């Protein structure tokens, strides 16, 4: 199955079911197809752990922060720094509308997360990843997933 077809099928399934959740193994397949395994030294398990601790695999999650900014999507990407929600000032370092981070095809969120991880702090940009994933054995995140 081609990369584009798999992403299309996963996003179609989510849209048809009006679901905002993606399964752990479906997400692992998409992340692998987008070459995140080993990206900047992080494993697929790191990415899965990040998505779980930030959003519980909820693609459409939006969270308001105490400073008035919002976090969007699977990776809870912040509107003050990374995306523009047109509600308050944003540096918009990913050059993306925050609403695009809620898209079931996941690509806008993945591309922005890759940009964030490419910076000096890597996944340490996410407090929840530091608290719950960093330095821990994460092999179980891929248990039962059939990857290519």
Swiss-Prot record:
Catalysis: reaction(s): Hydrolysis of (1->4)-beta-linkages between N-acetylmuramic acid and N-acetyl-D-glucosamine residues in a peptidoglycan and between N-acetyl-D-glucosamine residues in chitodextrins
Disulfide bridge positions per record: 25-145, 49-133, 83-98, 94-112
Superkingdom of source: Eukaryota
GO cellular component assignments: acrosomal vesicle; cell surface; extracellular region; sperm flagellum; sperm midpiece; sperm plasma membrane
Catalytic residue list: 54, 71
Membership in a protein family: Belongs to the glycosyl hydrolase 22 family.
Name of the protein described by the UniProt record: Lysozyme-like protein 6
């Amino acid at each position: 199955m081609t990369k584009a077809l798999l992403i299309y099928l996963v996003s179609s399934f989510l849209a048809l079911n009006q679901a905002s959740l993606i399964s752990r193994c479906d997400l692992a397949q998409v992340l692998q197809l987008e070459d995140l395994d080993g990206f900047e030294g992080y494993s697929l398990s790191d990415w899965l752990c990040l998505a779980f601790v930030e959003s519980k695999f909820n693609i459409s999650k939006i969270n308001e922060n105490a400073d008035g900014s919002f976090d969007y999507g699977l990776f809870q990407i912040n509107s003050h720094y990374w995306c523009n929600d047109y509600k308050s000032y944003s540096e918009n370092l990913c050059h993306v509308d925050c609403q695009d981070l809620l898209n079931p095809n996941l690509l806008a969120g993945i591309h922005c997360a890759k940009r964030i991880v490419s910076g000096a702090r890597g996944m340490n940009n996410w407090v929840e990843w530091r608290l719950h994933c960093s330095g821990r054995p994460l092999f179980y995140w891929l248990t039962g997933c059939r990857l290519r």
